[in-house]
Amino acid sequence: MRSVVTCRLWTLPGAPDARAQLPVDFTVDPQPPYLVPHSKEPIRLLYRDEHLLIVDKPTLLLSVPGRHPLNHDCLLHRLDRQYPGVSAVHRLDLDTSGVMVVPRTKAALSELARQFQSRQIDKTYFARVAGCLSPDTGEITLPLTRDWPNRPKQKVCFTSGKSAVTRWRVVAREDKSTVVELFPITGRSHQLRIHLKEIGHPILGCDFYAPE
């Protein structure tokens, strides 16, 4: 559990700016953000032209730099060394591997952002979840928001959460697990992991949301 310390400051009379003598609130997080170990896995280039790159991101590699200054090793920085000027138009979670589209020009960034925003680009994920998921297809609609005391986790919140929709299709059922194909209609952080956990079938291998 992470704690938060709240402090209050006053401006003293005679200070350089003595006009505002009301208390000022601010929040200090006493624990540093999570440090991501350096990943040795290479990035596979699947396609390249003058407008964009299509790459296969390995697991345990950030898509973009993390909040902590030491979390600088990421897919975007690695690609920028060889293809200067690349930018990020979407992300995959640290523990997720898969195909990413990386624009090389401002025009490509703008067009891809428009396509993602208007949901013209379909995203599909495969995962192994705990238990026997039933029925064969379904939809999860649970709003999500940040879990501030436990960042970077997210949580379900029906009062302030943003709408989040995930559809699933069962690919194979095994003794104690199910392989599913997931279709995120929205793209909230950790959406798939939280949605599967909330219906009682957490994604196996997920350190944040799957029970041990």
Predicted segments with their positions:
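RNA pseudouridine synthases
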Residues: M1-V165, V171-D175, L196
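Pseudouridine synthase
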Residues: P69, W148, D175-E212
